[in-house]
Amino acid sequence: MVQPSLRKDKTPFSNPSTDEIWLPERCLFADAANFYATGLHELVHWSGAKSRLNREMKGKFGSEDYAFEELIAELGSAFLMADLGIVGEVQHESYIASWLKALRNDKRLIFKAASAASKAHRYLMDKI
């Protein structure tokens, strides 16, 4: 089974070129729920690699392509949190403006994102 390589950093992110997830240490989060929510969000990104679910992940912060992948990760992490019984608030205010712009430009985007998030959810739950 392929497993993500976890690295400690102050900023969480998934690095497709090295197939690694960088996640701050637990002590840097307000509570365990936010730590797990962030880790699950990054795992959803990780699941989109060509060798896994092969999602097209492109675009820079603020672009519609980037917003789409972030929406997938946010929905996927919410699905995973629900299945795993993790209750908490996930706050990604920095993405909301780009989500709204992308959603206004494509009325079906939420359904496309939910479908991709559901696939990521199933993929990751099958690995547990």
Predicted segments with their positions:
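Catalytic zinc-binding patch centered on the HExxH motif and its immediate surroundings
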Residues: 1-20
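Long, well-structured alpha-helical subdomains associated
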Residues: 66, 78-128
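Active-site recognition of the HExxH zinc-binding catalytic motif
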Residues: 37-50, 73
